[in-house]
A protein has these predicted regions:
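Glycine-rich, proline-tolerant flexible connector loops at the mouths of alpha/beta enzymes
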Residues: 95-119
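Conserved, mostly hydrophobic/aromatic
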Residues: 67, 84, 92, 124, ...
């Protein structure tokens, strides 16, 4: 396995890819690496602990299942779409820049040339794949003006592309400013004491975060884009449901959630409660499908704020990302999908693969297998 170089900063996906071998070794005492990579069980248990084949009679919508395209960085657009169609997936979330990059979406070219945009869109249409969301995860409130300006422009261009495509959902991060006007790096503040931290947090929201997103939401609204779905992610000011709702209250109903439960599992959130709460408030705009496995021995020793920053640290980490079904079983995912149906979620389930053991195509296939089976169980139909 290639060791991560200290001379450069890898992307999260590069890091996770490089950690696969270490993770497999670290978990060998818990489960064999072969079992870690096999198809997860989709056996649904009743409360009595027996297999259930009963179907619900609720008039629930068949929520489409799709995938976020950074899972396939080495495939051309045509190759990726053929693979996605082969998995029987129905929708895609496409990265337009920022951290996800734009491997399959030459944003500026598509905006500049209507003919190119038409050809690009037809590739999806020909395979009956819906473009359900565009993603431009970045940090438009970064204290470095060049970074902030770049990411803000990517957001604006993504809005313009969404308008042309008729896409209503743009996925991203809230961003994180510095802690003062003179800071040069972001400062993620989660606790108000000692007092200077509380002052920094108040300054971030009042002077940077809320003003930027008010303007950004207005721009989106003017271009017929009404759903900005924020991933609740550590190192950004919106990192849990409470901070998401705080920004929504301050900015408006354009702000909603990209409910990526992989970041909420380790925070101790109940996924069904989160979905119900956000859904009842009309704030559920997108759903990343990604799992997290918790290493309880390390949680017991170190707590949950215990992440690996190098491959050498991974065996001591408290959690890491997995494909759907490899951190939590089919019963949990059935409850999650049921919750989305119960609140009338009108988006799609977007598989995001950041599993360090299962490469992109395999991780996506396994996640799709779980999600299609639990969806079929809930609807009383075949997967």
């Amino acid at each position: 396995m290639e060791k991560l170089s200290n001379s450069r900063t890898p992307s999260r996906r590069q890091f996770l890819s490089a950690t696969g071998g270490v993770l497999a070794a670290a978990t060998a005492s818990r489960i064999s690496s072969a079992k870690a990579a096999e198809f997860p069980s989709t056996s649904i248990q009743t409360n009595a602990g027996q297999n259930s084949s009963s179907s619900s009679t609720a008039p629930w919508r068949k929520i489409p299942i799709g995938v976020f395209d950074p899972a396939f960085p080495d495939l051309s657009l045509d190759q990726m779409l053929d693979k996605v169609a082969g998995y029987g997936l129905e929708a895609m979330e496409i990265g337009t820049g920022g951290y996800p990059d734009n491997h399959h979406c030459p944003l500026n070219d598509l905006l500049a040339d209507p003919a190119k945009l038409k050809v690009w869109k037809k590739k999806f249409d020909d395979r009956k794949i819906v473009i359900g969301a565009l993603s431009c995860h970045g940090n438009p409130v970064h204290p470095d003006a060049k970074i902030a300006g770049r990411d803000a422009q990517t957001f604006r261009n993504t809005v313009l592309l969404a308008e042309k495509l008729g896409v209503q959902v743009i996925v991203g991060f809230s961003g994180c400013p510095g802690g003062s006007p003179t800071d040069t790096t972001p400062n993620w503040v989660t606790y108000h004491w000692p007092p200077e931290y509380g002052q920094a947090l108040d300054w971030q929201w009042k002077e940077k975060v809320v003003p930027y997103w008010k303007d950004a939401a207005k721009f989106a609204r003017e271009h017929n884009v009404h759903k900005l779905a924020f991933e609740m992610h550590p190192n950004f000011v919106v990192y849990n449901p409470r901070t998401l709702l705080r920004l929504r209250e301050a900015v408006g109903e354009e702000i909603g959630a990209n409910c990526d439960l992989s970041h909420l599992f380790w925070q101790g959130c109940n996924p069904v409660e989160v979905i119900h709460m956000l859904g009842k408030q009309g704030a559920l705009y997108h759903a990343h499908m990604k799992d997290t496995v918790m290493f309880q021995n390390n949680v017991d020793r170190y707590g949950v704020l215990n992440f690996a920053s190098t491959t050498e640290e991974l065996p001591e980490a408290s959690e890491t990302f997995r494909a759907v079904g490899y951190g939590h079983g089919a019963n949990t995912w059935k409850d999650i999908v049921r919750a989305y149906m119960e609140v009338g979620y009108d988006g799609f389930l977007s598989i995001e693969n950041e599993d360090p053991i299962l490469p992109g195509d395999i991780g996506v296939e396994r996640a799709a297998y779980v999600l299609k089976n639990v969806r079929a169980e809930l609807l009383g139909s075949k997967a």
